[in-house]
Amino acid sequence: MSHASREYVTFFPYSNNKSCEEKNVRIMTATDITVKTLKTVSNDDAAYLASLVRTVPGFPNPSIIFRDFLPIFSNARSSRILIDSLIDALPVPADSIDLIAGLEARGFLFGPLLASRLGKGFLAIRKAGKLPPPVITESYMLEYGQASIEIESDATKPGQRVLIVDDLIATGGTAKAAANIVKRAQGIVAGFSFVIELTGISGMSELCDYPCSSLITMPA
């Protein structure tokens, strides 16, 4: 199954913040970031949303460029734009989704909001050790070791169609593990919805069996 088609428009953000630059934090430039063209979200709103995403080099270790999207939730306008955009960009029709599953931790910030707007339930995919038994556990490899995620063993009903959401896709390892755990719980993976897609990495290709969408693309 192929990805949902994605068209993007490059934009210039409102302004750079000198105080942020002095702290080794910068707001995106036009060569860094593109935003998906949407029918119901204006280019101005899309540009405003993306301008709130920060880049923090060297965090949490020197080899990482951290993409911080938490400022999007700092006001009602940007939160509304985010949910409107995610709904507009859904990779599958809303009526083909039964549950929204969010990955810990940042998928918990907007996953329930999206689920509420769509009239769906929410499934929390948690880091290992956070849920009482019985649970289903799925382990996967990271660049620096192994990690595990868990869901409650009765979190889905057989045949329920689950849209998995997260703030960012990089290598795709966590997302693929999320798909595996949903299937092990007898759910059906309806697709994936991401806020940010890092380019230059094979993340989306790891999910080529599922419809996928992302709102913002930027280099890894």
Feature annotation, model-predicted:
Residues 120-163:
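Short, glycine/charge-rich flexible loops or terminal/linker lids adjacent to PRPP-binding catalytic cores
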